[in-house]
UniProtKB/Swiss-Prot annotation:
Belongs to the NanE family. Keywords: Carbohydrate metabolism, Isomerase. The gene is nanE. Pathway: Amino-sugar metabolism; N-acetylneuraminate degradation; D-fructose 6-phosphate from N-acetylneuraminate: step 3/5. The lineage of its organism: Bacteria, Pseudomonadati, Pseudomonadota, Gammaproteobacteria, Enterobacterales. GO terms for molecular function: N-acylglucosamine-6-phosphate 2-epimerase activity. This is Putative N-acetylmannosamine-6-phosphate 2-epimerase. It comes from Escherichia coli O157:H7. It catalyses: an N-acyl-D-glucosamine 6-phosphate = an N-acyl-D-mannosamine 6-phosphate. HAMAP family: ManNAc6P_epimer.
Length: 229
């Protein structure tokens, strides 16, 4: 059975939660062994897949979880706004570390390596390709190039201002167009994740609301300060 078919079965049985275990950079939690522990806890709680950034974190996580891992490498480039898995060597390193799915930036922006080249390299390793997109045009273009999974990950992050709510409209438009959609980006409550599934998402990735303790504490602190001021 193919990995996509296996995921279809798991999603039907468990609801389609993917947990992104990406601690705040330089956080006390930003250690491979802690990332792996969070991923294992998420798997034991019913996550159908895990999203991991960085080769060392992926290697540590692969050693302890059996669910599929979506691997990415983030870089800050001087000559491109693209941050997610921008280079061939990133794809190769993630494949060697044990990723099942490799996600790349799928937006229409200047980049060091074309999307189609990265997708071909992912498929060369026999892995599934996911593209992190920001618009319907991004997603449909990536689907035509052969990406098996389209993520709404970058919606709201390629524009001057980022909305507070997730982009359910993008989820629906891509789903209606026949894409296998992972809803991602600002899904901070179970209700929002459920809404994404109702709008046609194949699965939903949740990160900050589960694995970024600093963000969660900030949300509580902000709300509580407003209540007493």
């Amino acid at each position: 059975m193919s990995l996509l078919a296996q995921l279809d079965q798991k999603i039907a049985a468990n609801g389609g939660l993917i947990v992104s275990c990406q601690p705040v950079p330089d956080s006390p939690l930003d250690k491979p062994e802690i990332v792996a522990a969070m991923a294992l806890a998420a798997e034991q709680a019913g996550a159908v897949a895990i999203r991991i950034e960085g080769v060392a974190n992926l290697q540590a996580t692969r050693a302890v979880v059996s669910v599929p891992i979506i691997g990415i490498v983030k870089r800050d480039l001087e000559d491109s706004p693209v941050r997610i898995t921008a280079y061939i060597e990133d794809v190769d390193a993630l494949a060697q570390a044990g990723a099942d799915i490799i996600a790349i930036d799928g937006t229409d922006r200047p980049r060091p390596v074309p999307v189609e080249t990265l997708l071909a390299r992912i498929h060369h390793h026999g892995l599934l390709a996911m593209t992190d997109c920001s618009t319907p045009e991004d997603g449909l273009a990536c689907q035509k190039l052969g990406a098996e999974i389209i993520g709404t990950t970058l919606s709201g992050y390629t524009t001057p201002e980022t909305p507070e709510e997730p982009d359910l409209t993008l989820v629906k438009r891509l789903s209606d167009a026949g894409c296998r959609v992972i809803a991602e980006g600002r899904y901070n409550t179970p209700a929002q994740a459920a809404d994404a599934m109702r709008h046609g998402a194949w699965a939903v990735t949740v990160g900050s609301a589960i694995t970024r303790l600093e963000h969660i504490c900030q949300w509580y602190n902000t709300a509580m300060k407003k209540a007493v001021l």
